[in-house]
Amino acid sequence: MSNAHHDAFDKATKAGFIIALGIVYGDIGTSPLYTMQSLVDNQGGLSQVSEAFILGSVSLIIWTLTLITTIKYVLIALKADNHHEGGIFSLFTLVRRMSRWLIIPAMLGGATLLSDGALTPAVTVTSAIEGLKAVPELSSIYQNQTNVILTTLLILMVLFGLQRFGTGVIGKLFGPVMLVWFSVLGISGLLNSLQHLEILKAINPYYALHLLVSPENHRGIFILGSIFLATTGAEALYSDLGHVGRGNIYASWPFVKVCIILSYCGQAAWILAHKDSGIALNPFFASVPEGLRVYLVILATLAAIIASQALISGSFTLVSEAMRLKIFPLFKITYPGANLGQLYIPVINWSLFAVTSCTVLYFRTSAHMEAAYGLAITITMLMTTILLAYYLIKEGVKPLLASLLMAFFAFIEFIFFLASAVKFMHGGYVVVVLALAIVFVMVIWHAGTVIVAKYVKSLSLNDYKHQIKLLRDDLRFDLYQTNVVYLTNRMKKDLIDRSILYSILDKRPKRAQVYWFVNVRVTDEPYTATYKVDMLGTDYIVCVELYLGFRMPQTVPRYLRTIVQDLMESGRLPKQVQDYTITPGREVGDFRFVIIEERVSHARQLSTLERFVMQTKASIKHVTASPMRWFGLQYSEATVEVVPLLLSDVLKLPIKEIKACTKDEKA
């Protein structure tokens, strides 16, 4: 990576500052919508709130944002960039060679982050729409929760429906809208805080620690389940590192943090002033003058949509990275914009919409959603902490120091996990079940890949290239294709899967001028596109190692065109002049791509567990994208050949021949 590119990544600009506000902080920036309301509701309402409770709650929020978001994520995790990309899978690619078991926290963290993404749009949009209850002109309509639900579902349907068109145009508005949002949070919070300056005492961590053991706190340590809502967007902050650059996050986070803290302080000041009034409104909206509430609801709805959009886009990126790391099934990906980073996965989009809509219908109110929210993300944060410990050791930090530092954060996050665990019985099981389902799919997919690698045998192309040459020149066989391209997941030097040679020589001899063997390797760098070629001293066998970054589309035909051109220009591959063509001077013949698909038959060598894994993976494949689409072959001539996983394993069933009786035997 060039120094100029590295400097740009660490540099802050005015435009980058605005863009960061729109992309990075949607989740954490909308937390003030529901965090204080959750604290008050779980305490038993305004009448049960005391000054010590409010001071302690705000202090807990301030120090959670400081320790988890600022120190762990902004100051430490942002340093762990994989060629300027962030997120749990990027972090995993940096440390995966240090220990094989690290794939476990990567899978758990990715699954819980993805399941959390299904709940975030539901809780943020519902909280914003419920703000209409505080608008006198509309309160009569929206006191009926059914109207809140219908409005929320309509917004979500439009939001998910627009994903296929990309966010290139509307995305430019995200930054300015969020700038206005954070400014309003800060200004309104400051104005309310000036009415009760004693709220500023919450900066002292004493009030946070005191509240945890105070009898005025009715929930004890479980209050942290509500406090954690204030920092749920910290993981998304790290995941979006590649979109905006480290410098812009460093520059924008202080502004965002101050505005968020002022908002919490302002809501707390309003609560102190009205704790005996019996008002049953969300402190976020109630702390603003009645005449301005409708505008705040509109702004809050826009902010909630932006936060939801960030989570949806983040889910697409997360799934695409998992697919390229071969720990998730392949699904169709499209790129609605000119930017490779702007992608769309239809199956994931509509699955998220279904889960989000069901969440709204099942929980009905934001209060019930908040009771279930946050449990999954505590697990994600714990998994990130484990991977960060290995990263620090890899970067030269003494193992003891790295372990102690990460143990400190792990302890805090584990306490949050325990405090949030009570949410399991209040709806948290929905997210947990969803996360476990995703983990199950990941484990099956990865284990299936390991099993195939264990049993599939390889043969040397050098041992068979003479046979291939004889086949190429054997005119008794019709020309199958000028170029036959075999896509393989496993190729090392001249070693390829036996099933490929079986397809060429045994199944039905395939005569061609050139035999291509292409292996796509996913690199740790996100945007790599390089290749290596070994022709084994021939002009009719081409072994291609195609190195693509984990964020690059694996459209093989597009890359192969360039490789063919390079080989012909360098004289390593004979030109294939075409006598009949509509393209004058065409020197490249036709291509046929062949994909070998291993299937489990009655494989006696497989254990019961291995057979279950392979059969389950085969079942999952029925609802995933075909290799044709994944490798961009839908517009090319391509064939999928099915072969048994173990070619030599032929199940012999007992059977006896019935011999015809002779005349003597009949007599």
From Swiss-Prot:
Residues forming coiled coils: none
Residues annotated as signal peptide: none
GO molecular function, one term: potassium ion transmembrane transporter activity
Pfam (any one): K_trans_C
Transmembrane regions listed in the UniProt entry: 16-36, 58-78, 101-121, 146-166, 167-187, 221-241, 253-273, 294-314, 343-363, 373-393, 399-419, 431-451
Topology in the lipid bilayer: Multi-pass membrane protein
Source organism superkingdom: Bacteria
Entry keyword set: Cell membrane, Ion transport, Membrane, Potassium, Potassium transport, Symport, Transmembrane, Transmembrane helix, Transport
Reactions this protein catalyses: K(+)(in) + H(+)(in) = K(+)(out) + H(+)(out)
One CC-aspect GO term: plasma membrane
InterPro entries in alphabetical order: K+_transporter, K_trans_C, K_trans_N, Kup
Compartment list: Cell membrane
Family: Belongs to the HAK/KUP transporter (TC 2.A.72) family.
Function per UniProt: Transport of potassium into the cell. Likely operates as a K(+):H(+) symporter.
Protein's name according to its UniProt entry: Probable potassium transport system protein Kup
Native organism: Streptococcus equi subsp. zooepidemicus (strain MGCS10565)
Protein encoded by which gene: kup
